[in-house]
Every structure is written in structure tokens, then in C-alpha cells.
Amino acid sequence: MRVKGIRRNCQHLWIWGTMLFGMWMICSAVEQLWVTVYYGVPVWKEATTTLFCASDAKAYSTEAHKVWATHACVPTNPNPQEVVLENVTENFNMWKNNMVEQMHEDIISLWDQSLKPCVKLTPLCVTLNCIDKNITDWENKTIIGGGEVKNCSFNITTSIRDKVHKEYALFYKLDVVPIKSNNDSSTYTRYRLIHCNTSVITQACSKVSFEPIPIHYCAPAGFAILKCNDKKFNGTGPCTNVSTVQCTHGIRPVVSTQLLLNGSLAEEEIVIRSENFTDNAKTIIVHLNESVEINCTRPNNNVRRRHIHIGPGRAFYTGEIRGNIRQAHCNISRAKWNNTLKQIVEKLREQFKNKTIVFNHSSGGDPEIVTHSFNCGGEFFYCDSTQLFNSTWNVTGISTEGNNNTEENGDTITLPCRIKQIINMWQGVGKAMYAPPIGGQIRCSSNITGLLLTRDGGNSSSREEIFRPGGGNMRDNWRSELYKYKVVKIEPLGVAPTKAKRRVVQREKRAVGAIGAMFLGFLGAAGSTMGAASLTLTVQARQLLSGIVQQQNNLLRAIEAQQHLLQLTVWGIKQLQARVLAVERYLRDQQLLGIWGCSGKLICTTTVPWNASWSNKSMDQIWNNMTWMEWEREIDNYTSLIYNLIEESQNQQEKNEQELLELDKWASLWNWFSITNWLWYIKIFIMIVGGLVGLRIVFSVLSIVNRVRQGYSPLSFQTHLPTPRGPDRPEGTEEEGGERDRDRSVRLVHGFLALIWDDLRSLCLFSYHRLRDLLLIVTRIVELLGRRGWEALKYWWNLLQYWSKELKNSAVGLLNAIAIAVAEGTDRVIEVVQRICRAIIHIPRRIRQGLERALL
């Protein structure tokens, strides 16, 4: 009985151990995650691409900028859309913005294209014999001299190249350079044009007025322009108020120095921007919040236009000048300018604390840098800005004017201007332009929206900082407008872990993987969590192809508007390049989806298991707390690896499907008798026979080794050895009866086929016996496991019933106890309340009884 009890206890321990092990396996199992591909998620990366321009230029206009714009730009979108990206922070850097470089190249193209049909004045690079020209001012009836205008004669080639004749023309003193003669005491009467030794001079065409029009820069399909809307953004660093646009605002390509004209204004207060305020070599861009009007005038004059033939099909325009053509000036309100300087000083003092701010004139250089140069009505003005930058501001904010001239103390600051006809071009070294004189009065009114300043270096311990007007690098002009934009590339593919797995034809070889990229027509879901953004994939995915189609329509409209010209300029090539790039990116993404087996799907599951080394965040952290941009940064280093694993997994899946389809050829019974199949049968039969023969040889060798170890050496496998009989059993035939000895020899066979048959028979019997034994063992094990499992289930069922009954009884007892306790408590409470009420009711009686006793 004791042994039986011990055995029964061991049985229970084994059952309990099995159940605990199973429960531990279930609880310790981690749910497997799989890579899922998403198409159309809001993710972008910084990129450089070819932008195209849009403008509202009229095709019939002859102004140079508008002619260029109609050839180069598409019409603007009448309903531009701007989508604010909630919960998005993006880094901007205005000093490393490729949009600035593109605009710089485009404006150079604008000027070059405007001047391309104009005449080069290389034949005028000859010796000029000049004398001073007196000009009559017909309004005041006075003679103006001083050598401002030179009347120069020179020899020039006519339409016939071997013929030379003498001509004369009027040049301004600033446009010619004297040539010294051998005799130093002689008067300088020999001159040359100022840029002949360094530049190729081009004469501006008569129709060129250089009047800038707003130009919008647009991103091609598959790209987007991010815009920073922070009102105090300094040009670098993170921006929290971000939106996405397809095109920038209209930017006027105004070429000027020192002062920025007709640009955009800061929304709240003045903003100063510099790549490094401590480096005095870096330009400081001042962005004003209120414009200061500047009115420039060149008084009326009469120009009798004449032209000189300088070769076949080329003419040089000059003329007789009546009136002082060089007398020009610009007016600025003193109060507005001083108020603007005061606000600029406050902002500069934030960077240079407790220092006196000094504004001074330019330190020298080319005339374009020393003066405020700009174009007004086709004439190039060079205005002296000394009066604008001639003040000192101490720490208390009080200004001290550097010049006490009474004329300056008026309400208006008047800047004297000079006009040049030979201009040093800003596009690069070695280019110059001759602007023919323009008759009549010239007026232009502009708005100063910014300043370009440079800071003097030197002793850092000095108590004052000197700022001077700068400029000359037109990239700073464009940078002052493009500071809040950046171009990004939309990545339409994204990958993330999910619990869903693709159902495929099973096979063991599998890969691992996950990650992605994404596309976005509108990036409105960029700040949403991954779970929320995945619900808008259809809208965003459609934007990619529709954006390509829209861009193609814009290009075709532009070509149709110019079909009478059909000039495929560099801008036409840019348009085509942008469209081809968008199509290529779209096809590349579709190709990847096809390779991964996800064609036409926005959400595509895979058989690639998610590796925790890529990201060990939980599903809730990923889908409910992270945006797609944050997730992209998390797994960016593993994107290529996951793409490769998805591709390998899909290749394996296709191989599995191919092998499955190959089994269909056995569906037809007639295919079993194909000669190809018969050859395959013969090959399999030969392999089986060879294997059996090899097994027979192995078993024979093992048998010999076994018998040798027992001390028995057979003479031959085919020798028939008689069986010895005991002394009590005489020799006889088999038919005589009696049990023969077990040690008798095996049957002797003759011939190769008989030997093979005997071996096959023995091998089959051996295999049969072993398989039968194995089957019996497996059956016994399964029966034992089934019985034990059934007993375990019954035990668990009884245990469950027992505990259910116990829990039920406990619950009933608990409810009864609670009911009894509540009832008793309720009775006590009622009794106490009754006593209190009776006591209160009996108070008057007790009082009366007390009074009665007192009276007695």
C-alpha cells in the first residue's frame, strides 16, 4: 500500500509539473511582429532638385523681364494651397539653401538672355580723342561745364571692313579712362572706355528696361517646399510653425546694393540675420517690419538720338545732350529713416551688448559697392548713401548725427546720384554693359524693405561697433526672400511592424526585414501619429500621380502660349527635366512595390519578421505616440537592409509558388506515361537498387566483423555447413521429424540475380520488422500520452468543478454574512434612532415633572 501511495503521489507531481511547464511556455511566448509596407505616408527628406518658375507675365509684353518670364515660367496657380503641419518641427538654414543658388543662376540667365541680341561694343575699344563738352541747360539758360561730358572722336570700321572713317560720340567722365602720353606735361586728351582692358562690353537694347516682376519658384511633383511661419525666425535652427506649399510667394529680382528694395516685410518686429555675428566677414541682413519709401528722379532732358555704324549689322547709339542728364537724386523721409535706424540699433544691441553702435559710410571698393546702385527706368543710378549711414547711437539710445549741415536738418534726406552708362555687371568678372542715354524725365518710387550691413573688425575690447553698408553679392538679395523656404523630397514608401503576416505558400527558407519611405501630396498628416496618418494613405498616394499630370498640363499650356515662337530654351529643358524626374521617381516606387509583391496596395503585409534590434519599441509606442517622421529617423539606418530582406522573401515566395505550380503536371494520368517521366522512374529505380546493394555490403561487413570478434572465420558465404546432431539424435532427413537445431546454416543460393533477390527479401523483412516495432512503440507512446492527457483533463475538470463549488459556497457565505451584518447593523441603527427620537419627545415631560417636584 505504501508503494502504491508513493506511485500515486509521483503521478500527481508529474501531472503538475507538465501543467506548470506548459503554462510557463505560454506566458513566456512573445507575440511575433512582421514587417508591413505602407505607401503614401507623410515623410520627407532634405533634397536638391530643379525648381521651375511661375509668373503672371503677359506674352505680348516687350519688357525684358516679362519676355524672359513668358519663355521660362508657367502661369501661376489662381488658387494656391498652403497646408499647416501640426506638431511638426523642422530645421532650416538660409545660408546653405540651394534655392538661393538656383535663383542666382536664373537671374543671370534673365540678364544674359535680355542682352543676348544686343550689340557688343568691342570695336569701340580704340583710342578716343576727347575734349570737354559744354552742355546748355535750356531751362535756366546756363552753360554747364566741368568736364562731366567728353566729346570724343575716333576711327571706326564701317559696313565695309577695310574702310575706316572718323566718328564722334559723347561719353561721361566716369565711363572713360585717360591714356598717358609720353610727355607728362601734356594735357590728357587721349582716352579709352573704362572696361575695355578687362571686360566684354555689351550695349543694352533699346527695349531693355530691367523692370522686375514677381517670380514664384515651384517644386516639381514628388517634391514639396516647406515654409517657416515663425514671425521671429532668424534663418537658422528649428522652426515649430511649419507649412507646406507648392510655390513660394512672388519674389521681385531687384538688383541693388546696400539697400534691399521692394521685398517682403517682417510681420512683427525688425529681424537681423547673419551666419555668424561674431565673424565680421559675414554680411548682416536686416529685415524691416515697415518699409521706407525712396523716390528717385532724373530731371527732364532732351536727347537727340543718333547711331554710328560699327560694322555689318551693328550700330552704336549716342546723341546730342541738351540739359544735365547726370543730375539725379533720391529723397527719403528723415523721420522714418531715423525711426528705422533706432529699431535696428535695438536689435543690434541684443547681439553686441553695452556697446555704442556707429553707422558709417562704405570703406571703399567698386562704385557699385561704395554707393547705393540700382536701376531706375532703364538708367543705372549710383547714389551716395553717406547721409543715411552717418550716425552714432550710445547705450541710452540717443543718436548723434555725424554732420551738422543745416541742409540735413530738414524733413527729407536728399541723396545725390550719378548715372553711369558703362556698367560693371554683377553676374561675374569680365562683363560690362553700355546703357544708351534715355530721354525725358525719369521717376521711380521704391520701398526699402531691408539693409545689407558689414561690421568692422579689430579690437574686440572696443566700446563701439562700426557698421557700414555692404552688398555686391546678389545671393544675399535673394537670401533675404528665400530664408523661410526649403525643398524636401517626398518618400512615398514606409515600413513598420504589425501583427499581420502575409499568407503564402509555406517553405522553410525565409528572410527578415522591414522599413520604408513615403509619399505625400499634401503633408497635412505629418504631425499625426502613425496610426492616424495610416488612415489617409489613399488621398496622399493619389496626389503623386495627379501632381505629375498637373505639371505636364502646365508645361503644355506654356508651350501652347508660346507656340508662335517654339523656342526650347534652357527653361524648357528644366521643365521637361522636372517632369521626367517626377515620372522616374513614381515608376521607381511602383517598381519596388512590384518587386515586393505589393502592386496596387496601400498597405501590404510581408513574411519578414521584425527584428527587435531595428527598434525595440512596443506597438503602442510606435502607433499611438510617434509620427511617421520620428519613426523614419528611428529606423533610417536599417532601411536598405529591410528592403533587401523583403525582396529576398518575395523571391523565395515566388520560387515556392513556381514549385507548387509544377506539381500540376501530375494532375493528368496520361502524363505518368510520358517518356520523360519514365526516364525519371528508371533513374529513381537505379538509385534505389544501388542504395540497397550498398546497404547489403555494409551489413555484410558488419556481420563479418561481428563474427570475427566471436572467434568464427567463415570460409565462404556459399559453403553449406552441416548441422551437428546430438548423440541421442541420429542422422536423418528433414522429413523424419524432430526439431532441427537453430545453428543450422542459411539457405545456399546460386547466381547473381538469386543473390540480389535474397538480399532484397532480407532487407525488406528487416525493414518491415523494424518499422513494425517503431509503429508499435509510437502507438504505445501515443496511447500513453492520450491516457495521461485524458486523465490530466479529467483532473483539471474535477479541480475546476471543485474550486467552482468552493468559490460558489464562499460567495454565498460571504453574501449571507454581509446580509446578516447589514440586517443587524440596520436594526441597531433603527433602535438608536428610535431612542433618540423618544428622548427628544420626552424632554417636555421631564421638564414638567421637574417643575412639579420643585413646586412641591
Swiss-Prot record:
Region annotated Immunosuppression, chain positions: 574-592
Span list, region MPER: 662-683
Name recorded for this polypeptide: Envelope glycoprotein gp160
Keyword line: AIDS, Apoptosis, Clathrin-mediated endocytosis of virus by host, Cleavage on pair of basic residues, Coiled coil, Disulfide bond, Fusion of virus membrane with host endosomal membrane, Fusion of virus membrane with host membrane, Glycoprotein, Host cell membrane, Host endosome, Host membrane, Host-virus interaction, Lipoprotein, Membrane, Palmitate, Signal, Transmembrane, Transmembrane helix, Viral attachment to host cell, Viral envelope protein, Viral immunoevasion, Viral penetration into host cytoplasm, Virion, Virus endocytosis by host, Virus entry into host cell
GO terms for MF: structural molecule activity
Biological process annotations from GO: clathrin-dependent endocytosis of virus by host cell; fusion of virus membrane with host endosome membrane; fusion of virus membrane with host plasma membrane; positive regulation of plasma membrane raft polarization; positive regulation of receptor clustering; viral protein processing; virion attachment to host cell
UniProt organism field: Human immunodeficiency virus type 1 group M subtype B (isolate WMJ1)
GO CC, any one term: viral envelope
Region feature (Disordered): 716-742
Gene: env
Stretches in topological domain Cytoplasmic: 706-856
Spans annotated as V2: 152-196
PTM entry text: Highly glycosylated by host. The high number of glycan on the protein is reffered to as 'glycan shield' because it contributes to hide protein sequence from adaptive immune system.
Disulfide bonds: C53-C73, C118-C205, C125-C196, C130-C152, C218-C247, C228-C239, C296-C330, C376-C444, C383-C417, C598-C604
Start and end residues of each stretch annotated as V5: 460-470, 462-470
Region named CD4-binding loop: 362-372
